[in-house]
């Protein structure tokens, strides 16, 4: 499996609920292109317009850019020129949905604000990706600042993944499919806004209600739901349900944190994986070369 294999949903090839839906995207970087790729996987006919300088993601990660744009017709246009605008509106006339990732003033300068588009293309639905909702939509930001605002950064280290962007891409998909469905029913375009800071807040919800996070039930409060050191690496245990907890206690020689830690220390990653398969335990172990915990104190030894 390639590193980008998880980009697309693993549905049967015959599952194409968006067949016949025509989507145009002007969104650069990560959330918009990820959403576009997944809409294409569901059968939508997708196109993308990039500025003459291209999408910055191409230089940041060529492999991810290629994966996101496989099967996408990409066209370079300067939307600040009359020829570029004429070409854009020709595509919009044949589109059902437009994805953008500009701040509101930039949309207005390009003639892509809601009022202008509704007048020119009343059938067209739009999903506008912004950093923050409502009156804060013009405030700049990126994944890191959205995670910080949501309280998802608990050290000075950078996060290990772009959680707000990737979660945001799924929210964009949800909005896109909902807009298409309502527009089909009403005959009128639907205009929605997705804020990436809201997506980060959504991802933070389990922490906010006290379910996850340091010291919470799923943040180290349960001995059977934790990360331990094993003989040659690390092991993640998720024996949450009673039958899993009972199986773990039986093979570990006890249910206490000390008993589980001792059991993990005396086995290697491969041994623990084999035991997990034999006893139907939710466990994943990996050897030392991959075991580089980012936050000291999260690993039980």
Locate predicted features.
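Short acidic/polar mixed-charge low-complexity motifs
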Residues: 73, 188, 233-235
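Alpha-helical interface/anchor segments and their boundary "cap" residues
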Residues: 206-257, 261, 266-274, 282, ...
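Glycine-rich phosphate/adenylate-binding loop
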Residues: 167-218
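A short glycine-threonine-serine/GTX helix/turn-capping micro-motif
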Residues: 157-167, 191, 223, 234-236
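N-terminal helix-loop segment corresponding to the beta1-alpha1 unit
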Residues: 1-184, 212, 267-274, 292-301
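Glycine-rich beta-alpha junction loops
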Residues: 53, 131-134, 196-201, 232, ...
């Amino acid at each position: 499996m390639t590193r980008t294999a998880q980009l697309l949903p693993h549905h049967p090839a015959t599952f194409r609920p968006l067949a016949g839906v025509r989507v145009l995207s002007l969104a650069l970087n990560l959330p918009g292109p990820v959403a576009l790729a997944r809409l294409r996987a569901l059968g939508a006919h997708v196109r993308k317009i990039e500025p003459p300088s291209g999408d910055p993601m191409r230089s940041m990660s060529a492999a991810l850019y290629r994966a996101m744009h496989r099967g996408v017709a990409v066209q370079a246009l300067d939307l600040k020129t009359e020829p570029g605008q004429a070409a854009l509106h020709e595509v919009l006339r044949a589109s059902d949905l437009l994805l953008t990732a500009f701040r509101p003033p930039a949309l207005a300068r390009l003639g892509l604000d809601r009022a202008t588009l509704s007048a020119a293309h009343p059938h067209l639905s739009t999903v506008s990706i912004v950093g923050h909702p409502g009156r804060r939509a013009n405030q700049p930001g990126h994944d890191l600042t959205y995670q910080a605002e949501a309280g998802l950064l608990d050290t000075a280290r950078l996060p290990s993944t772009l959680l707000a962007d990737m979660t945001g891409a799924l929210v964009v998909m949800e909005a896109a499919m909902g807009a298409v469905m309502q527009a089909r029913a009403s005959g009128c375009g639907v205009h929605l806004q997705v804020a990436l800071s809201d997506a980060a807040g959504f991802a933070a919800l389990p922490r906010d209600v006290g379910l996850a996070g340091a010291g919470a039930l799923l943040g180290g409060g349960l001995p059977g739901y934790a990360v331990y050191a094993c003989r040659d690496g690390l092991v993640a245990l998720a024996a949450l349900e009673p039958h899993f907890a009972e199986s773990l206690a039986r093979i570990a020689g006890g249910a206490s944190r000390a008993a589980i830690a001792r059991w993990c220390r005396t086995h290697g990653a491969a041994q623990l994986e084999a035991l997990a398969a034999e006893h139907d335990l939710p466990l994943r172990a990996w050897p030392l070369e991959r075991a580089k915990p980012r936050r000291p104190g999260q690993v039980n030894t």
